[in-house]
Amino acid sequence: MHNENYSIIFSSMTGNTRKLADKIHEILPKESCDYFGTADAQGTESELLYIGFWTDKGNADSDTLDFISKLKNKKIFLFGTAGFGGSDAYFQRILGNVKSAIDSSNTIVGEYMCQGKMPQSVRERYVKMKESPEHPDNIDALIENFDKALSHPDADDLERLKNIII
């Protein structure tokens, strides 16, 4: 995988997925990189595409879904971040949803997901919800997850990504 030209294409709303994209770019040979940036026609020239997304309602963001649905005959490494990082099963469900948008002529050569921090407005919404007598039973767990996510992607997340890439 390291001897061919590649592109790193990503969507990042809060900077989390950008951190992963930067790490991949740091690891791989610079001279083999055809494109680094957001979804763009020139990024599709490479045979190997590293495609990064942020999670929106259990799937990739709409820009990424639109981009990947048009790809044909590519090798694809998926990477993404999600605010809720409770389990690998959750990450696998997201990846499964993303893969279902990819044409069968493409080959998935790898994948990686980790937790990512969320905007402060999310925590404020949770706290406001908790004040309501009809708040969800899991509201404390949601607030705890938000607080845990603040440091992600962290050094351990980036090291795990590096180990998958190399």
Where do the protein language model's features map onto the residues?
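N-terminal beta1-alpha1 ligand-phosphate binding loop
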Residues: 2-27
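FMN-binding flavodoxin-like domain, especially the glycine-rich phosphate-binding loop
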Residues: 3-4, 27-31, 46-51, 56-166
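The conserved SAM/SAH-binding core of class I Rossmann-like methyltransferase domains
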Residues: 9, 36, 79
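N-terminal beta-loop-helix "entrance" segment that forms/cooperates
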Residues: 18, 22, 40-55
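A short, well-structured beta->alpha microelement
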Residues: 29-42
